[in-house]
Every structure is written in structure tokens, then in C-alpha cells.
């Protein structure tokens, strides 16, 4: 029997880490889907980035991508854990499944998915509230960096400037970057934490030509200097 869990929360609250740990502790098949969420007045959602799936797939190679139609065979459906992630700024008004935004329910119909559990950071006690922030105003910039390669010195300088206000008041930044030696680095920063998180992923790109894998940056904050960042 499949388990379909829907999880939401504000940017940077810890959704992806919770999902990773949940998958690691599960012995059966695992499937993942990320939805884009919805912007509100003065609160702009980031585009539906591929960063989270690329990171999770690197850590769990057999993870199924549910954004691809017919990606689950009948055999895969046996005892599968499906987690659907989407960003949401506000705490749902109702508990459990009754609190799911109807727009999400309608969107899931095209994937033939119906959640039987719903958790939201800031509402449900089993989820950490350490980095669950109450955003009142937020802008978003997302850049596709596929085939871009960064030398480490330039990348470190850019990231330092970014999180220290050179391009506006950044509240949240997340990126997957390619290095010349084939390494794949996840950068993660949120204003509520001290310092950035860096993780070298398992995947190494061949050194012949530019890498085709996902490389993106998502920046959220206030008074962002779009032109300087681009």
C-alpha cells in the first residue's frame, strides 16, 4: 500500500532535509514531486526549481521522479512512500488533510495523486520550527546555470557578497554549482542560521565538455538588485 505525504512550509524551513531523512529511514520504494506553490500579495514564490530533486536523487539514486508521467511501474507502486513538497508562506487554517490548499488538490489530480497525510512547518509539532520564518514581504530571483562552470575563487567571492548584502537583503539562497574538476556543490543559506552550508555531492561530471546536469540558483529577499545578480 502506498503512502502519499504532502509537506509544506516557508522558504528555508527545512523541508528538503526532512524529506531526505524520511526517505533514508524507509525501506521500500521512494518517489518525489515538487510543486511550485503560489505567490501572495508582497510574497513572491520562487520558480519551481529542480535543485531539490537533483540533490535528493544524488543522495538516493533509486528515487523516482514523479514529475515524469508514467515513471512508476506497477511493481514500483508496491509499498512506495511518495512525498510531495511545496512552498507555502502561511500556516493552514485547518488541521491535517483539511488544511490543504484546494489549488494543490486540483494540481495533484493530473498526477493521479491523493495525499493521505499533510504536514506543515510551523503547524505540526513533529516538525522543527527553528528556521520557520514569518515573511511579510519577499522577492525572488531564479537563474538557470546549466553548462556554467565556476572557478572556486570567483564562486566563493560571489557567494560571500550575495549573503552579505551586496545585491540586496537576501533572506534565503540555494544553489547547485559546477566546478572545473567535475565536482557538484550544493550551497544553502538562510538568514536565521550562522553561516552557509556547503555540501559536495556524490555525482562527478566527466571532464569532456560542459556538464548537462541541473545547475541553478534561487535567491529570495527584499530590494534585490536583479541586474547585478544576473
Residue ranges and their predicted role:
Residues 42, 52, 73, 98-101, ...:
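Serine/threonine-rich low-complexity intrinsically disordered regions
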Residues 2-92:
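Nucleotide-state-sensitive switch-loop elements of NTP-binding domains
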Residues 76-77, 86-136:
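Long, charge-dense, solvent-exposed interaction surfaces that engage phosphate-rich ligands
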Residues 40, 44, 74, 78, ...:
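Glutamate identity and glutamate-enriched acidic tracts
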Residues 2-18, 31-33, 126-230:
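P-loop NTP-binding site
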Residues 27-31, 50-58, 95-119, 165-169:
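Structural alpha-beta junctions
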Residues 23, 53-55, 86-90, 121, ...:
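Phenylalanine-focused residue identity feature
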